Amino acid sequence: MALSRPVRLFSLVARLILAPRRGLTVRSPDEPLPVVRIPVALQRQLEQRQSRQRNLPRPVLARPGRLLVSARRPEFNQPARLTLGRWESAPLASQGWKSRRARRDHFSIERAQQEAPAVQKLSSEGNFADLGLEPRVLHALQEVAPEVVQPTTVQSNTIPQLLRGRHVLCAAETGSGKTLSYLLPLFQRLMVQPSLDSLRIPAPRGLVLVPSRELAQQVQAVAQPLGRSLGLLVRDLEGGHGMCRIRMQLARQPSADVLVATPGALWKALKSRLISLEQLSFLVLDEADTLLDESFLELVDCILEKSHIADGPADLEDRFNPKAQLVLVGATFPEGVGQLLDKVASPDAVTTITSSNLHCIMPHVKQTFLRLKGADKVAELVHILKHHNRAERTGPSGTVLVFCNSSSTVNWLGYILDDHKIQHLRLQGQMPALMRAGIFQSFQKSSRDILLCTDIASRGLDSTGVELVVNYDFPPTLQDYIHRAGRVGRVGSEVPGTVISFVTHPWDVSLVQKIELAARRRRSLPGLVSSVKEPLPQQPDFDKSD
C-alpha cells in the first residue's frame, strides 16, 4: 500500500507527457524545426504599419506631369492638374511634423506659372493714357521710366478711381506696382490744384506716410524724378536723428510739395509746430497693414486728426479750401481699417480694390519647407549660401535675403557667417540711424549678395534683384510670411524667385500646415481679413446708481 501512491503518480505524469498535444502535427525526423527570428509582437506591429501605408489614398496619375506639391515621400505628391475641393481633406506632407521623428523631412510648393499674376495681359492699345492721366504726367512717366509701358492690373483698377476723387483702399499682392498707382494721381491732383500762399511753416500738399526709413527713402527715390519733371518738389522726413535733424530737414527752402515721412518724425514736427497739414490735399498710408498695427496706430490717429479728410469727391472741388483725399495701400488687408475710416470719413466714400490673388500663395515662386532641429539650422544655412555662390547659372543671378525674428539673432548669425568667410550685410531695427542709412541701397546695388535682416526689410522695399529668400526663423504670422515671400517674384524681376523656410517649433508647423492646405486647394490663406468691417455700435454707459 505504501508503494501504490508513487506508482499511481508516476503513471499519471507519464500519461500527460505521452498524450498528443493540440495544434501540433507529426513531423518527420528530417524536417527542420521553425526558427523565430522576429518577436511575434514586433511582427504584428510591422504588419499593422504596412497595412496602414497600403490604405493611404494616393493621387492616381493617368500619365506623368508637373507637380503642384512635391514631397520627400512620394505618396504626398499632388499633380498640378489636381485641385482639392474646399471641403475635401487630403493627407499633408507636414501632418506629422510636430513629432521629432519628422526631422529632415521636407516638401515644396512648385511653380504653377512663370509670369507674376500682377502683370495684366493687355492688348497693344492698352496703356496709361486710357486710364485718364494727363499728357504732362504721361510724358514725365515716359521720361523717368521708359520701360514702364503697360499698367498692371492693380494700376488699371486704382488710378481711375483716384482720379474721380474717391477714397481708395487698395490691397494687392506684393510687387504689383502699387507705388505708381497712387503717385501718378497724386501728381496730377497737385498739377490741377493751385498752390496757395505758403504759411510761415512748411505746409505740404501731398503726404505719403510709411512705416520705416528705408521705405521712405525708396518712395522718395521713385517720386523725386517724377516730381522734378513736373516742377514739383519731393522730400523725405525720417526719424531716428533727433529734433535738430528734423528742424534742419524742414528748414530747407523752398518747402516740399510732397513729403514722404515716417509717423514718429512727422508727429514730433507737428507737436513742435514745425509743419502744418492745413493745405494737405492728398494723403497716402503706404503699407497700411503695418501702420494700423499697435506700434503705429496711436501716432497715425493723431496725424489723421490734424488732417482735413474730405467726406466725398464733392469736397475736393473747392480749390481754396483744400481737403485731403485718403489712400490706404497694403499687401495684406489691414485689420481695424473699419474703425479708422469711421473716425475720418464716411465708409460709403471709400472704394475697396482687392486683387484676385490677395492672401494667396504666389503661383510663380517655388516655396520649400524644411523640418529641422534648432541646432541644425546654422549648418543648413551655410550650406545653402555656399551652394548659391558656387551655382553655375546661364542667366542673371540674384541676391539673397535671410530673415530672422529678432535683432540679436541677426547679429549672432552675422558672426557665424564671418567665421565662414561669407560676405554679407546686416539690417535690423536696433541699429543706430547713421549705421542703417544706405544699407539697403547698397544691397540693391549688389555691393553684397547676402542681407541678414529682420522684418524691417519685408515691407514695401523694392527687391527686384532678389532671387532667394531664406526664413531662418519662421515668421510668427501668416501676414509676415506673405510679406517675406513677396520679396521675390516681383514685377520686373529678371530672376526666378525661391523661398526656403526652416521649420523648428510646433507653432511653426501649425502655420506650415495652413499654408500647405491652402496651396493644395489653391485658395487664400485662412484667417486673414479681406473686407472692411464696420465697427460695432458702442453701448451706452449706464450709471450704476440708477
Curated annotation (Swiss-Prot):
Motif (Nuclear export signal) spans which residues?
180-191
What region holds the Helicase ATP-binding domain?
159-351
Task: State a GO cellular component annotated for this protein.
Answer: nucleus
Q: What is its main location?
A: nucleus
Q: Which UniProt keywords apply?
A: ATP-binding, Helicase, Hydrolase, Mitochondrion, Mitochondrion nucleoid, Mitosome, Nucleotide-binding, Nucleus, Ribosome biogenesis, RNA-binding, rRNA-binding
Q: Which reaction does it catalyse?
A: ATP + H2O = ADP + phosphate + H(+)
Where along the sequence does the record place the motif called Nuclear localization signal?
Answer: 520-523
Q: Where is this motif: Mitochondrial targeting signal?
A: 3-18
- EC number from the UniProt entry: 3.6.4.13
Q: What are the residue boundaries of the Helicase C-terminal domain, all occurrences included?
A: 377-536
Per the annotation, the residue ranges of the short sequence motif Q motif are 126-156
Q: What class of enzyme is it?
A: hydrolase
**Residues the entry annotates as binding ATP:** 172-179
Q: Where is this motif: DEAD?
A: 286-289
List the GO molecular function terms: ATP binding; ATP hydrolysis activity; RNA helicase activity; rRNA binding
- Any Gene Ontology biological process: mitochondrial large ribosomal subunit assembly
Keyword rRNA-binding applies: yes
Q: What does this protein do?
A: Plays an essential role in facilitating the proper assembly of the mitochondrial large ribosomal subunit and its helicase activity is essential for this function. May be involved in RNA processing or transport. Has RNA and Mg(2+)-dependent ATPase activity.
Tell me the subunit arrangement.
Monomer. Found in a complex with GRSF1, DHX30, FASTKD2 and FASTKD5. Associates with the 16S mitochondrial rRNA (16S mt-rRNA) and with the mitochondrial ribosome large subunit (39S).
Please give the PANTHER family that the UniProt record associates with this protein: RNA HELICASE
Name it. Probable ATP-dependent RNA helicase DDX28
